[in-house]
A protein has these predicted regions:
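Bacterial N-terminal signal peptides that target proteins for export
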Residues: 2-12
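General marker for long, soluble alpha-helical cores
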Residues: 22-345
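Bacterial N-terminal signal peptides
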Residues: 12-23
Length: 345
């Protein structure tokens, strides 16, 4: 037998060994463990699925209506009984087997992908979806209608991660259309998700527009929601004497705790025409109504906002002002600040 002929069986054995040791990822089963709790409301359950694969460990927990499952009924008894039920989604079917009692249960699950769904997704531009991808789509109920709806709304070729994020956070086709009708079209998936996460809804936009805020960016809207610059806050500030401000100013006031009560307190002491910048600067540097009241009681009733801020920046305390006033009844704010700058006490 030639050397070449003898080498062929060895090569075949090597290939077979490699195949046995390193199975193809596509052949790996999608399965794992599940834990279910029946919620106080009879029609909902909390389901947690846990998997360990070559990707690592993953866990997903969601509240579902019991109608999302086929064959799931709540046992009357607190004693475990065998259970088998399914979650049928466009992307495939999850089959759950294990034990259930009146409070919940646990067991193993497996997932069978739907090849027809994968083919439809390929036609929509989402090709090369793995079984792992399809499992994720099933868990989060990313169905044909959702993907087609986003495509029709102007998002035909979203990445898989964008699809999942938009589904999880409720950036639905209807949400996208509603925003587009208000002038917010062509937003990025990240912008849409951020708006949903922080509650920058069409209703929120409408309330702001009623107050004169017509051309806010998506970033403005998200920042206002994050920091609590709500329509109610803006109305309160207007009633206190600070009229329409920019989105940035509204956010700055919220960050630095400029409240309607703060502004009203200052107005009562003669500061009738505060700007949002004035109010923010006073809050940043600790010019409180109490500080202003004490300074005025020492005779500095005409101190401007800039004077008050300068006094706080340079450490002109009420005790220092009182002591200097006792020495020189005619001392001015500028002189007090200069004394502190140069270390005189």
């Amino acid at each position: 037998m030639s050397e070449k002929s003898r080498s062929r069986p060895a090569l075949a054995l090597a290939i077979l060994a490699a195949t046995l040791v390193f199975p193809r990822v596509a052949d790996a089963a999608i399965d794992g463990r599940w834990i279910l709790e029946f919620e106080p409301k009879e029609d909902r359950v909390q389901l947690t699925t846990k998997r360990t694969s070559w990707h690592g460990h993953s866990e997903n927990s969601c509240s579902y209506p019991t109608s999302a499952f086929r064959g799931l009924t709540r046992p009357k008894s607190s004693t475990d009984s065998p259970a088998r039920f399914e979650m049928v989604r466009d992307a495939g079917t999850l089959t759950f087997e294990g034990q259930l009692d009146s409070g919940g249960g646990s067991g193993r699950f497996s997932f069978q992908a739907d090849s027809a769904f994968a083919a439809d997704m390929a036609k929509l531009g989402h090709d090369h979806l793995s079984d792992e991808n399809l499992y994720t789509m099933a868990v989060h109920d990313i169905d044909r209608a959702f993907v087609r709806g986003l495509a029709d709304a102007g998002y035909p070729r979203l990445s898989f991660d964008d699809l999942v994020a938009m589904r999880i956070h409720g950036a639905t086709p209807q949400f996208v259309r509603d925003l587009a009708s208000l002038g917010y079209s062509h937003l990025s998936p990240d912008d849409l998700v951020a708006m949903r996460i922080h509650g920058a809804t069409p209703e929120f936009i409408g309330e702001l527009r009623a107050l004169g805020y017509e051309r806010l960016s998506s970033d403005d809207l998200v920042a206002m929601r994050i920091h609590g610059a709500t329509p109610e806050f803006l109305k309160g500030m207007a009633a206190a004497g600070i009229g329409k401000v920019s989105a940035d100013d509204a956010v700055a006031m919220r960050i630095h705790e400029v409240t309607p009560e703060f502004v009203r307190s200052l107005r009562e002491m003669g500061y009738d025409h505060l700007s949002s910048d004035d109010a923010v600067s006073m809050r940043i540097h600790g010019v409180t109504p109490e500080f202003v009241r004490q300074i005025q009681a020492l005779g500095f009733r005409d101190a401007s906002v800039d004077d008050l801020v300068s006094m706080r920046i340079h450490g002109v305390t009420t005790d220092f002002a009182r002591k200097m006033k006792a020495r020189d009844p005619g001392v001015t704010v500028d002189e007090l600040v200069s004394m502190r700058i140069h270390g005189r006490d």
